[in-house]
From Swiss-Prot:
One of its GO terms (biological process) is translation. It is found in: Mitochondrion. It comes from Marchantia polymorpha (Common liverwort). This is Small ribosomal subunit protein uS11m. The keyword Ribosomal protein applies. Belongs to the universal ribosomal protein uS11 family. The gene is RPS11. It comes from the Eukaryota. Keywords: Mitochondrion, Ribonucleoprotein, Ribosomal protein. HAMAP family: Ribosomal_uS11. GO terms for molecular function: structural constituent of ribosome. Its main location: mitochondrion. PROSITE patterns: RIBOSOMAL_S11 (PS00054). NCBIfam families: PRK05309.1.
Amino acid sequence: MQKKHGITNMQKKHCITYIQSTFGNTIITLTDYNGNTKTWSSSGSVGFKGSRRSTNYAAQATAENAARVAIQLGFKFVEVRIKGLGYGKESSLRGLKLGGLIITKIRDVTPTPHNGCRPPKKRRV
C-alpha cells in the first residue's frame, strides 16, 4: 500500500488568519497552512475612510467580511495570529466569530523589543 501524500481533509478546512491592528487601520489576511495568501480585507477596502478606519466597528466589519469570504472558499476552522497595538484587536476576533468561523487558537505575535532601538520622541501637540 502506498503512502498518501498531500493535504489532509482537516487541513483543507483549516486556515491561518493574521490580524494586523494599527492605530490607523486593521488588515486581515487569510492563508492556508503553507502560507499562501487566499484572501485579505482591510477597513479601507470594506468602505471606511479617514479616521473611521481605526474604530472598533470598522475592525469588526472587516473581520466579518473576511470570514464570509473564508467560508465561501471552504474554510471552517481558523487559527488567529494578532499583531499590533491598535483598537481593533478584540473587535476583529468578535467579527470572525460572528461571521461563522470557529476559532481554534489565538496567538499574539506582536514584536516587543528587548531594549533594542531607542523609540521616537513623544509628540507635543
